[in-house]
């Protein structure tokens, strides 16, 4: 069964065709990074206008690469939230238009669930119950999954998301946008020599990164940072220490079979290394191209929703503030 996935929640316009929820036939992403980097962050109005220009060519390329016509598509899965309203509207309306014109079922997908399904596209099928650490630009969530479509939120950030913290720290250090990859690169030539705080929040699986960011800012303002690479490595280590330790504690408490990693920050090299080295349980870490925003993960998640009866009407709307549990 082939699913067409469409994703436009932030600054990537993406379309993909996935067979049976696990085989990627095509996965096209048109990135707007070059456009937004001159502003140091995503400009929502610019993003939605760019999605409008890219959406139809990207969908058409994805179908062509998969050698698939609309008549072979069993359902269209599209991200309807969370994300930027103007960006989401473009993908959702493209999906609705095709669904209406071709009589194809429409399946709305929560972007955060989509990120988790990168783990179903990585060659091995995860075992339930599993604990997923989703770390992206807008979210840092620890989610327990006991089956497809069953999400229980065990912990979340109380302030900045991990990706947001990376992006803000990069700005403080004068590194390029997007900040996460820039800090990752700079860290490779640095030593984690700065003493930065870690927020453990005892008795809770929640996270907090705003104090760490402020501590870095103070050190920079006081002239106590002599090497950008060392500061980047110190900041990255502080974030990763907390993410890994809290994830392993939570996995132990809930007695899961496996840990899954998801979201853009899952592309971080130190996080990938530390989590797999320190975990006594199997850890699923998707390839980097499936961690950042793409439509194959939306198609995969949409497939598992669709085969268990999930389908949406054409009056389905965007939900910019959707959480991992609704
Ligand atoms: O999941 P994503 O592509 O978009 C959202 O849904 O937010 O995540 C984007 C976030 C950005 O904050 C970016 O800086 C971060 O993921 N990121 C990284 C790395 N690659 C992307 N953070 C740390 N290390 C990386 N290598
Ligand atoms: Zn994302």
Swiss-Prot record:
Residues given in the record as substrate binding sites: 134-138, 167, 180, 184, 268
Family matches, as InterPro entries: ATPase_NBD, Gcp-like_dom, KAE1/TsaD, TsaD
Compartments reported by the entry: Cytoplasm
UniProt keyword annotations, A-Z: Acyltransferase, Cytoplasm, Iron, Metal-binding, Transferase, tRNA processing
EC numbers for this chain: 2.3.1.234
Free-text comment on the cofactor: Binds 1 Fe(2+) ion per subunit.
Enzyme class: transferase
Pfam families with a match to the protein in the record: TsaD
Gene Ontology cellular component list: cytoplasm
Molecular function via GO: iron ion binding; N(6)-L-threonylcarbamoyladenine synthase activity
BP GO terms, sorted: tRNA threonylcarbamoyladenosine modification
Catalytic activity: L-threonylcarbamoyladenylate + adenosine(37) in tRNA = N(6)-L-threonylcarbamoyladenosine(37) in tRNA + AMP + H(+)
Keyword Acyltransferase: yes
Binding site for Fe cation: 111, 115, 293
Physiological role: Required for the formation of a threonylcarbamoyl group on adenosine at position 37 (t(6)A37) in tRNAs that read codons beginning with adenine. Is involved in the transfer of the threonylcarbamoyl moiety of threonylcarbamoyl-AMP (TC-AMP) to the N6 group of A37, together with TsaE and TsaB. TsaD likely plays a direct catalytic role in this reaction.
UniProt record similarity statement: Belongs to the KAE1 / TsaD family.
Protein known as: tRNA N6-adenosine threonylcarbamoyltransferase
UniProt organism field: Dehalococcoides mccartyi (strain ATCC BAA-2266 / KCTC 15142 / 195) (Dehalococcoides ethenogenes (strain 195))
Gene (UniProt): tsaD
